[in-house]
Design a protein with these regions (language model features):
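Glycine/proline-rich, positively charged
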Residues: 27, 31, 87-205, 213-219, ...
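N-terminal binding-site loop/beta-alpha segment at the start of enzyme catalytic domains
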Residues: 1-78, 141
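Conserved, mostly hydrophobic/aromatic
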Residues: 6, 18, 43, 51, ...
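Structural motif corresponding to the early beta-alpha repeats
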Residues: 57, 73-92, 117
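Short catalytic-loop micro-motif centered on adjacent basic/acidic residues
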Residues: 50-56, 146-150, 172-173, 247-249, ...
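Conserved residues at the C-terminal ends of beta-strands
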Residues: 19, 54-57, 114-117, 151, ...
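Structural motif
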Residues: 42, 46, 105-106, 166, ...
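Structured C-terminal cap/extension of enzyme domains
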Residues: 49, 68, 187-413
Length: 413
């Protein structure tokens, strides 16, 4: 296993991190807890020392199972990363309650890497008003958290604003060879690294879509390469090729995939790809773009939208759905990111057809017309799904307040 150093702390982290959002399931659809624990320990025994979870993953069960997996001496071998969900925070007491509950759930006295989860511009402004920086300072001072950071799918401008707002130790962004200009992108990666922040990467395989069953035209490119690698290995090596990257998270839930990722992480040095390797990846990237429904490059010239639509983000989800129609999670990711579930609503259905975006688009895309297509394809169930999921998150938060009441802290119940 190769390791990279967190600039501000000197902490040495495995370049491969274990993402705890996609645990293996049983035939009946529940989490296969025994297999999950075996897989987590398999990764740790192979050198992984960074594990990333969150309260919302598996509707609260991810942290519970991770805490159990880290018994028997495994906690001392790793760094735990988990997240504070802004959508469950309404006052400073909620911050305290959620963190203390996480410590109990994870069976630990401290969180090594603590993130504000999936920050958007509005959720970040709300958290600042509620005193998030004072909370982070206090939690670091009393030892409950060691390092503070954030994750985000926001555009580059918002990302830079968040980076500049606080003395963060690290951040977490989506990054892969299709997202060089999407969300924070390469510019954001380099900007954060220039601030001496560690950068953790999520979605290096775009939820697994850049691995496994890829379009035939893409597989043909990999097959013609002089070096034989799986689609997953090509994608992971591309991310690790960037020296600014600290950890790449993989939602590993298959023993063979864990072994493959561990093998690749033994040799994936920054700057290790040859020019012909990069040319092969660029051909695959260009073919993906050719296959996409919308030729959006994610440049952001169309933003901000007066109606609040995340135009590049909506197009990215729409293209992913077109490329990987077998992936049933794409629409749910769209709803989560743009349907108002974990931040302000930014879906295509908000488009007012004003045309401002089309005038600014360097690709000359008919954006208002395309927004109708995106809404038609991606938002059919949004009016039903979002209220249901929001209700679930509200119940999780309410249960926390009830727990606080029955344990005696009645002043905040």
């Amino acid at each position: 296993m190769l390791y990279r150093t967190v600039p501000k702390t000197g902490d040495r982290l495995s370049i491969l991190g274990f993402g705890c959002m996609r645990y293996p399931s049983t035939r009946t659809g529940g989490i296969d807890e025994e297999r999950t624990i075996r897989q987590i320990r398999q990764a740790i025994d192979g050198g992984v020392n960074y594990l990333d979870t969150a309260p919302v993953y598996h509707m609260g069960k991810s942290e519970v199972i991770l805490g159990r997996a880290l018994a028997d001496g495994y906690r001392e071998k790793v760094r735990i990363a988990t997240k504070l969900p802004p959508w469950s925070v309404f006052d400073r007491d909620d911050m305290e309650r959620i963190l203390d509950t996480q410590l109990e759930t994870l069976q630990t006295d401290h969180i090594d890497y603590y993130l504000l989860h999936s920050l958007s511009k509005s959720s970040f402004e709300s958290m600042k008003m509620l005193g998030i920086f004072a909370f982070l300072d206090s939690a670091k001072k009393d030892g409950r958290i060691r390092h503070a950071g954030f994750s985000t799918h926001a555009n580059n401008a918002v990302f830079r604003e968040i980076v500049d707002s606080y003395d963060w130790d690290f951040c977490q962004i989506q990054y892969n060879y299709l997202d060089e200009k999407n969300q924070a992108g390469t510019d954001g990666l380099e900007y954060a690294a220039g601030k001496k922040m560690a950068v953790m990467i999520m979605e290096p395989l775009r939820g697994g879509n850049l691995a496994g069953r890829v379009p035939a035209a893409i597989q043909a490119i990999w097959d013609k390469a002089p070096v034989k690698r799986s689609p997953a290995e090509w994608a992971l090596r591309w991310v690790w090729n960037h020296p600014e990257v600290t950890v790449v998270l993989s939602g590993m839930n298959d023993e063979a995939h864990i072994e493959e990722n561990l093998r690749v992480a033994d040799t994936a040095l920054p700057g290790g790809l040859l020019e012909e390797d990069l040319a092969t990846i660029h051909r695959a990237r260009d073919e993906y773009w050719r296959l996409m429904k919308v030729g959006c490059t994610g440049c952001g010239y169309c933003m901000p939208c007066p109606a609040g639509v995340d135009i590049p983000g909506c197009f990215a989800s729409y293209n992913t759905h077109a490329l990987f129609p077998h992936d049933r999670t794409t629409k749910f990711h769209y709803i989560g990111q743009h349907g108002g579930l974990m931040g302000e609503k930014s879906s295509a259905g908000l488009c007012r057809q004003c045309g401002k975006c089309a005038k600014a688009c360097p690709q000359h895309l008919p954006i208002p017309a395309l927004m109708k297509d995106v809404a038609r394809e991606m938002e059919g169930m949004m009016g039903v799904v979002v209220p249901v999921l929001k209700g679930g998150l509200w119940c999780m938060n309410k249960l926390g307040r009830v727990r606080r009441f029955v344990t005696g802290d009645k002043s905040h119940a």
